[in-house]
From Swiss-Prot:
Entry similarity comment: Belongs to the IF-3 family.
Keyword Transferase tagged: no
PROSITE patterns: IF3 (PS00938)
Protein name: Translation initiation factor IF-3
InterPro entries: T_IF-3_C_sf (IPR036788), T_IF-3_N_sf (IPR036787), Translation_initiation_fac3_CS (IPR019813), Translation_initiation_fac_3 (IPR001288), Translation_initiation_fac_3_C (IPR019815), Translation_initiation_fac_3_N (IPR019814)
Gene name of this polypeptide: infC
Coiled-coil regions listed: none
A Pfam family assignment: IF3_C
Length: 186
């Protein structure tokens, strides 16, 4: 009978370089073994695997780039579980900051400007950066000072929230923009 899963398992072990080598997959002749109690000893690979099997545990290569490679005698399943748990915890603690964009034109009405500034305020309170963009069309390009006035009035309305002006008002082609970021407490 042909074992069709053997090739799949072998390919899986080759493709995943991040996975640690365990037991018979370790290719070194000699290894530095760290036992569960913390003591170290340099052993041949056969003796190290034999001691791991006697303890009912696995020989796991932790540092392959050292001569001789460093291996630990531990339960590989538990070790892998704790590694994954630690990675999930780190991922959960990361704060993802998104860049929100608020677009307007230089001939915006005061009510619309109030509405847009409330949106900017809520984005900043949520912890997101905000890119405020003013798009000029046609003859409006001759009156860029209107754009600077609008951006300054928005910054005044948002003034009660702690924010950092990440990029001052710039003109790029037909658009004027500035980027505002929330100020985080450390």
């Amino acid at each position: 009978m042909i074992n069709r899963n053997a090739n799949r398992d072998r390919d899986r072990s080759r493709s995943n370089d991040k996975e640690l080598k365990i037991n018979y997959r370790i290719k070194a002749r000699e290894v530095r073994v760290i036992f569960e109690n913390g003591t170290q000893e340099v052993l041949s690979i056969e003796d190290a695997i034999k001691k791991a099997k006697e303890a009912g545990l696995d020989l796991v290569e932790v540092s392959p780039n050292v001569s001789p490679p460093v291996c630990k005698i531990i339960d590989y399943g538990k070790y892998k579980f704790h590694q994954e748990k630690r990675q999930k915890e780190q991922k959960k603690n990361q704060k993802v900051i998104k860049l929100k964009e608020v677009r307007m034109q230089p001939k915006i009405d005061t009510h619309d400007l109030d509405f847009k500034s409330k949106n900017i305020l809520s984005f900043l309170k949520d912890g997101n950066k905000v890119k405020v963009t003013i798009r000029f069309r046609g003859r409006e390009l001759a009156h860029t000072y209107l754009g600077y006035g609008i951006l300054n009035s928005i910054l005044e309305k948002v003034g009660d929230v702690n924010y950092v002006l990440e990029s001052a008002a710039k003109m790029e082609g037909k658009t004027m923009f500035l980027i505002v970021a929330p100020k985080f407490k450390k």
